[in-house]
């Protein structure tokens, strides 16, 4: 081999040796989503540092000598981030070790962008964060209050928690001052309890999430205890839009098969003729209802259905003929037609006029009967004080040798007043008798 050939081979070898690392570097820097890995654990690749540390911990925990109890990310930029690990000796559990910067637990990142183009990379956490959620005011959120002492009063148990908590869920703030939705004893305790509350969204965003979903515990009071908060072990009082999972309230998942707009689902609107024939003219324009057409058509398909399938259920109109000798050509009883109209308002005028007439007749009848009774009683009680030549009688008599005179004229004024009083009493008595009947 000539010296020139040897030099050429050496040049190629050196060039390859120089290019290989750069090829690996380019591969790690090619376009793709961010992936975090732990140096000594290639299977730990994840979208977040925390997930990568946990995957590596699971693998490391297979060690016969050490029990790796935790591995959490300790972020300090791309070149100086580690998984902080805690591991315990399996032979002697009292031996506990920690390491915040072990070389074998160093984190590194691959890729050059977030998997979701709308996300924003947070350099301090190494996580791609989604855009802020629109926080809706009044949105309901089931939250567990703090564990608090149980107070007994009047034979009933109460939780002295001081009121509803606040919560930050998916960067939205929830609060308010609601009454407890349910209260329980902490499981296994008789002196400590908690209450669940239905908080409402304030419409404001918040920082780090801080919340605990509603949950259940042991019953705070017997079920039949009056004037106490609910304590059903199978229902903490999840609000609409949330469901009981058996341990806590969770968001009720939406059905992806349901259309967002129920007025525009896909489907074939078919029309079925009632004239014995089968109209097959289905309109594939997004109709929702199946309409029954009223057109006739023989059973052999002579009638060509023209169902429009527009979603209103009008169905197809059969254009065929029907033989009454062979088929029932009736289209069925005809339903009510027309449309609803505003009713004509009624009036009480006729009824009022009728009763006014009856009242007037009753007044006249009462007046006639009162007059008749007054005249009758007037004849019984009338004193004709003018009888005797325009002068009241004056009688003289002798008793035991003495003369006495009784002159009615001396009492003319009193008798006249008595006459008027008797007439008035007679009229009142007659009126009472008539009204009683």
UniProtKB/Swiss-Prot annotation:
GO biological process, one term: virion attachment to host cell pilus
Annotated Low complexity bias: 218-235, 252-265
Predominant cellular place of this UniProt entry's protein: virion
Coiled coil: none
Cellular component GO terms, alphabetical: host cell membrane; membrane; virion component
Signal peptide bounds: 1-31
Membrane topology: Single-pass type I membrane protein
Biased composition regions of type Gly residues, renumbered to the chain: 266-319
Bilayer-crossing regions: 415-435
The protein's assembly and partners: Interacts with G6P; this interaction is required for proper integration of G3P and G6P into the virion. Interacts with G8P. Interacts with the tip of the host pilus.
Protein name, entry field: Attachment protein G3P
Gene: III
């Amino acid at each position: 081999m000539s010296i020139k050939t040897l030099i050429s081979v050496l040049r190629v070898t050196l060039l390859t040796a120089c290019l290989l690392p750069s090829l690996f570097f380019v591969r790690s820097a090619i376009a793709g989503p961010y992936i975090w890995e732990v140096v000594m654990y290639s299977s730990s690749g994840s979208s977040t540092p925390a997930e990568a540390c946990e995957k590596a911990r699971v693998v490391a925990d297979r060690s016969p000598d050490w029990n790796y109890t935790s591995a959490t990310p300790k972020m300090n930029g791309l070149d100086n981030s580690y998984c902080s690990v805690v591991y315990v000796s399996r032979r002697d559990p009292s031996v506990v070790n920690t390491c915040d910067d072990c070389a074998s637990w160093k984190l590194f990142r691959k890729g050059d962008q977030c998997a979701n183009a709308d996300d924003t990379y947070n350099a301090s956490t190494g996580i791609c964060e989604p855009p802020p959620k629109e926080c809706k005011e009044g949105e309901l959120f089931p939250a567990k209050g703090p564990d608090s002492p149980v107070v007994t009063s009047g034979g009933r148990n109460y939780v002295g928690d001081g009121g509803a908590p606040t919560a930050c869920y998916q960067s939205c703030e929830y609060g308010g001052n609601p009454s407890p939705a349910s209260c329980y004893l902490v499981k296994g305790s008789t002196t400590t309890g908690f209450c669940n509350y239905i908080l409402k969204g304030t419409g404001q965003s918040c920082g780090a999430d801080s919340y605990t979903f509603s949950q259940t515990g042991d019953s705070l009071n017997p079920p039949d205890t009056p004037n106490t908060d609910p304590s059903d072990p199978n229902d903490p009082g999840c609000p609409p839009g949330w469901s009981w999972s058996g341990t806590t309230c969770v968001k009720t998942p939406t059905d992806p098969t349901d259309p967002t707009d129920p007025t525009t689902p896909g489907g074939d609107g078919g029309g079925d003729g009632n004239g014995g024939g089968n109209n097959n003219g289905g309109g594939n324009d997004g109709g929702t209802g199946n309409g029954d057409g009223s057109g006739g058509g023989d059973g052999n398909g002579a009638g060509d259905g023209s169902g429009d399938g527009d979603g209103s259920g009008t169905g197809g109109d059969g254009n065929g003929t029907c033989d009454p000798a062979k088929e029932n050509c009736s289209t069925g009883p005809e339903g009510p037609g027309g449309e609803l109209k505003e009713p004509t308002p009624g009036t009480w005028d006729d009824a009022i006029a009728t009763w006014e007439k009856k009242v007037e007749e009753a007044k006249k009848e009462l007046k006639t009967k009162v007059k008749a009774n007054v005249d009758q009683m007037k004849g019984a009680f009338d004193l004709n004080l003018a009888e005797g030549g325009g002068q009241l009688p004056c009688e003289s008599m002798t008793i035991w040798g003495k003369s006495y005179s009784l002159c009615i004229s001396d009492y003319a004024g009193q008798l006249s007043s008595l006459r008027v009083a008797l007439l008035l009493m007679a009229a009142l008595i007659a009126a009472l008798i008539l009204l009683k009947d």
